[in-house]
Amino acid sequence: MPEFQDVEFIRTELKTGLTFSNIALQAKDAAKISRNTANARKAYDTLLRFMDRSMLSDEDLAELDPMLVRLKANLLELGEMV
């Protein structure tokens, strides 16, 4: 069973990554796009490493997977190779 803190960390990191990627997608300023894309990518990379080590329940995966898919799609749209 995963630790509650693990799931909360992953959930928070996903929301943070999605926020940064959404800001980048809506931005017009190149520096803002670049900065927020980089932050979203850091969140995504951290998530992949952390999720690899966490034993998430099926219920947790059902909640978190769609958010991870959305973050990956946003990063692809921003030109990231994920």
Regions found by a protein language model. Give the residues of each.
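Short terminal alpha-helical segments
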Residues: 1-27
